[in-house]
A protein has these predicted regions:
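Ordered alpha/beta subdomains of enzyme catalytic regions
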Residues: 1-142
Length: 142
């Protein structure tokens, strides 16, 4: 399956909703609550980030970047036009395919460390101003 389908439906319009001139979007993954943890547990263990980002890279390489641009982008146009009942503009996806990589920078805490609740474990930011929209577009997958 095309990796760009692995998002929440409403995020397919985010690229049009950011304020004009947006160039950078910085996002984080933070454990927000310990309400289901045993009483007195106020930390979580950081783990899995290396696997997730390696998987993300490999998945997009195999299911988007290594496939013909017309094939993957026309599939996106067809499905998203039906889903949104409009003639969906895929220019931003075509430009991403031309780039041939996900333009993001990821930072994470070391795996295995205990992290207090409400402390970010992972941050993600776009590395190309043109692709400010990709940061939160990928959030669902992460």
């Amino acid at each position: 399956m095309n990796g760009l389908f692995l998002t929440d439906g409403y995020k397919t319009g985010h690229h049009q909703q950011y304020p004009k001139g947006t160039e950078e979007v910085y996002s984080n993954w933070t454990p927000r609550s310990n309400s289901y943890a045993p009483v007195g547990c106020d930390k979580v263990v950081s783990f899995g980030q290396q696997y997730v980002f390696e998987w993300l890279h490999d998945y997009f390489e195999a299911n988007f970047f290594s496939k013909p641009k017309d094939e993957v982008c026309n599939e996106l146009k067809e499905e998203l036009s039906l889903y949104l009942n409009t003639d969906y503009d895929i220019t931003h996806f075509e430009e991403l395919h031309d780039l041939q990589y996900l333009p993001i920078k990821v930072k994470s805490l070391p795996e295995g460390v205990e992290v207090p609740i409400k402390v970010p474990m992972v941050t993600v930011v776009n590395t190309d101003k043109k692709f400010y929209w990709i940061t939160n577009f990928l959030e669902t997958i992460l």
